[in-house]
Amino acid sequence: MTSMLARISSTAEAEAALEAGADGVECAVGADIAEIARAVGGRCAVTALAHPAYGSPADQISALGAAGAAKVRLILSEKDCAGDLRALALYSGPVRLAAALAPQQGDDRDLTALAARCGVTDLMIDTGGAGRLLDHCGPVALSDFTESCRAHGLACAFAGALEAPDMPRLLLLAPDALAIDFSMSGPAAFAQMRALIPSEKTRLTAPAAGKRVDFSLMSERGFGVDLDEGDAPTDCIFVRGLTVPMRIGAYASEQTRLQNVRFTVEADIIRAAHAGDDMRDVFSYDIITDGITLLAGREVFAMVETVAERVAGLILRHRRVAAVRVKVEKLEVGPAGVGIVIERRRAAETADIRQLFPGLRGAGKPKG
């Protein structure tokens, strides 16, 4: 289950964030941790941010822990990440240790291994105010980071000017936490993002009589639920002409080099019960594009037929998808493109509650 953390700097922001549904708070460097911890009153864990520029990490952790922080996240300096991590190893108290890396450091698996050896339990990629996370890191890089954290027993988290459209994309990777800057987003946008992230309080069971289930909201949270769609009307969402490099082909030489492959996907989506104008009411086409990008960036395929089936299967895991048509074209075979077009409908036996893309890093059935 992915937790939603609110980056806050005052007790007022902490109260507002908890009211909006935050699972935890991360306090800015310099915030009054003792005052915030008293205001929170045990309703959630309090994490404090620290930075090497403000003194010895071990001393900062001790002071912040004494003030009420259960966890301290050290923002690693870009010049000496390894040195900062080793400094964390000097701390031996009860406060849990976490760290934040810049996006360009997220692919350094040696740093991930060092973080684990130095007592860090939670590693985050954070742009640190330098723009949107997904402008710095694509889904494959973030997936690799998540996998590296899992391999070393670390929780993984993402931060960096996150917005509502980022939620379904990042949830595909099943991170342990997403951190949202509450002061930047504001209460309304924060609440919208909260609605897109599943929580332990989310009810996935059938509603009482007269209660309406917002299936589109459930979908954008990354879950599917049983629907008796029958002849329910559908709308078509499409991605056409998406060209990505991948290793594909029956010949060994094809499996060791990248070649361009073009995808066109049309998905018939069960129409929402009401018209909406935000991310809670739509099927995000990023689920399609990011799913293709992840497959292309992480696997080697022999046949276009296999690729088409995998893409169709990924999309059909989404419970609002009634049918999908997938066209896959190899563009570098002889004088013309070659490929396949398949059409698949969601089989009845797939109609249980599940997290989407369960093959990606530990995603599984949610707790009901």
Regions of interest found by a model, annotated:
Residues 1-26:
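N-terminal basic/disordered segments at the start of proteins
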Residues 7-11, 28-30, 49-55, 75-79, ...:
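Active-site beta-loop-alpha junctions enriched in small/polar residues
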Residues 9, 27, 31-32, 56-59, ...:
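Alpha-helix N-cap and loop-to-helix initiation/capping positions
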Residues 12-20, 53-67, 106-114, 162-177:
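Catalytic cores of alpha/beta
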Residues 23-32, 67-80, 124-131, 173-190:
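Glycine-rich phosphate-binding active-site loops on the catalytic face of alpha/beta enzymes
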Residues 35-39, 88, 134-135, 182-219:
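C-terminal helical cap(s) of enzyme catalytic domains, especially alpha/beta-barrels
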Residues 41-140, 144, 148-155, 212-228:
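Conserved anion-binding
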Residues 199-368:
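N-terminal, polar/charged subdomain of small-to-medium soluble alpha/beta proteins
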